[in-house]
């Protein structure tokens, strides 16, 4: 029942005690860095790497997020690249060399314009920090609606390309970053919150991105949950039978509807 209660976002009960299993802190990973001329090239490399290895990190940044971070850090990121990949390898010794060679081979096969291994901790951390700075960097450009859609890995390129097309169609900037190794993306819908027309278009973009994720066989939430903003898409995500079953479970465990009312149903 653990997954049922955790996934219910507080609508079935309140967690009062949690037992954690701790694992040793890993040593810093080697990080392979690559810039790509197209989204398709970058996501093709993600699929290739993930089919050969189990990297510790596979992070993606699109052109909007690259440029936002470069505006903030001036660290020399390639402003003309359509995508940046960071692939982490926590193997050591000979195994690390073999894995990194396979990662770089995938980069080359998929047309990376620049690639290298940040094998010292300081350089690796600078690129990981750049990825972590993507959200605050984009928040400097305007108000942000953060999405959390995911798809099966082979559809990742279709999703990211489609996200960009949706933004362009509505005249709204969308910067996408992703935990690309599992197909989980965070499109950031950037808009002027003082402009009612932009607010309306941003909401349309938000909804169409979720429609696209569902159409591609994915999910409206890879990490952040349904909450209140995504309720309207929940039945389309689950299908009518699974949605009805969820409502029956809710009714059985919370007949008075007092647990986190209005969330995720």
Residue ranges and their predicted role:
Residues 1-265:
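Noncatalytic alpha-helical scaffold of FAD-dependent oxidoreductases
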């Amino acid at each position: 029942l653990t997954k049922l209660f955790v996934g219910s976002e507080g609508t079935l009960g309140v967690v009062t005690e949690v037992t954690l299993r701790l694992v040793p802190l890993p040593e810093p990973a080697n990080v392979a860095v690559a810039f790509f001329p197209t989204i398709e090239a970058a996501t093709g490399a993600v699929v290739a790497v993930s089919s050969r290895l189990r990297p510790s990190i596979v992070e993606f940044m699109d052109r909007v997020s690259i440029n936002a971070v470069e505006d903030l850090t001036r660290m020399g990121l390639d402003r003309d690249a359509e995508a940046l990949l960071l692939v982490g390898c926590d193997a050591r010794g000979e195994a690390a060399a073999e894995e990194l060679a396979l990662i770089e081979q995938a980069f080359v096969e998929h047309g990376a314009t620049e690639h290298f291994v940040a094998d010292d901790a300081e350089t690796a951390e600078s690129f990981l920090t750049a990825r972590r700075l993507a959200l605050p960097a984009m928040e400097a450009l305007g108000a942000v609606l953060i999405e959390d859609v995911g798809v099966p890995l082979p559809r990742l390129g279709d999703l990211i390309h489609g996200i960009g097309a949706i933004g362009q169609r509505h005249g709204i900037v969308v910067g996408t970053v992703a935990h690309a190794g599992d197909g989980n993306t965070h499109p950031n819908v950037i808009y002027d919150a003082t402009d009612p027309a932009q607010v309306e278009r941003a909401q349309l973009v938000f909804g169409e991105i979720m429609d696209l994720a569902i159409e591609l066989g994915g999910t409206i939430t890879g990490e952040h949950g349904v909450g209140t903003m995504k309720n309207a898409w929940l039945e389309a995500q689950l299908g009518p039978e699974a949605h009805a079953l969820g409502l029956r479970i809710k009714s059985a465990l919370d007949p008075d509807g007092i647990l986190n009312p209005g969330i995720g149903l």
